[in-house]
């Protein structure tokens, strides 16, 4: 019963930022801009994904002092990233009071096989996923929120779209098998393809969606990008490099928040998309060497 209560508490926090925008920030000034723009939360990190991609090297957890400065400066929730499998980085982030931990493929993985046992923590976790199997495995480990991996730092939404479609298609298969009474197929799918307990599969079949909130992330750079992902069924969006690598961060941040809340109103999205200044320079995915693709980290 204690485990259930803890899971409900973690998932409850994740639902608090539903329909909102989480913005990457690297300093107090950016965090205040994000808060004033209406961000539901900020992700505190020393380098946005675009800079990590360009500068290379080993990307690690941010300096706790920088994260605490941002926590002191804003009233909205503050998230921070830990490396995949690096449970000590997660312990540190929990100890300084971050509101949610992102076990992130944007940072250099500490463990290429094992993810963090998120059930051992009080703080809720968000994790990336490219398909239903990855999403459910992270939920089985204790994740309270899922996000598409996309391809961070590119300003190109194509991978986020691909990952969201893959999750939706997987859910449709589960629901279809369940409604047709094909329990043997569901058991086989759980065991051989998704590699998760049947209990989670049945929860998906009943809810007809993931049992936790599912945000879009990776390559979102414009209000239309945010609305696109929301119309595909996302519960909110993460925006990394797309705001503070653009020509007018303050206006673009507000526009993306407006588009996320009003994702089904094209006239309003068109209005807030006017005169935003230059968007961040995007990268075509096929121009990225295979070994530099971040979304492949952590399956």
From Swiss-Prot:
User: Which residues of this UniProt protein bind D-glyceraldehyde 3-phosphate?
Assistant: 165
The residues listed in the UniProt record as binding D-ribose 5-phosphate, with positions renumbered to this chain, are 24, 153, 219, 240-241
The organism sits in which domain of life?
Archaea
Enzyme class of the recorded protein, top EC level: lyase
Pathway noted in the entry? Cofactor biosynthesis; pyridoxal 5'-phosphate biosynthesis
Q: Which reaction does it catalyse?
A: aldehydo-D-ribose 5-phosphate + D-glyceraldehyde 3-phosphate + L-glutamine = pyridoxal 5'-phosphate + L-glutamate + phosphate + 3 H2O + H(+)
User: Single GO molecular-function term?
Assistant: pyridoxal 5'-phosphate synthase (glutamine hydrolysing) activity
Q: Which HAMAP family does the record cross-reference, listed alphabetically?
A: PdxS
Entry similarity comment: Belongs to the PdxS/SNZ family.
Its quaternary structure? In the presence of PdxT, forms a dodecamer of heterodimers.
Which NCBIfam families does this UniProt record tie to the protein? PRK04180.1 (NF003215), pyridoxal 5'-phosphate synthase lyase subunit PdxS (TIGR00343)
Q: What is this protein called?
A: Pyridoxal 5'-phosphate synthase subunit PdxS
* Organism annotation: Methanococcus vannielii (strain ATCC 35089 / DSM 1224 / JCM 13029 / OCM 148 / SB)
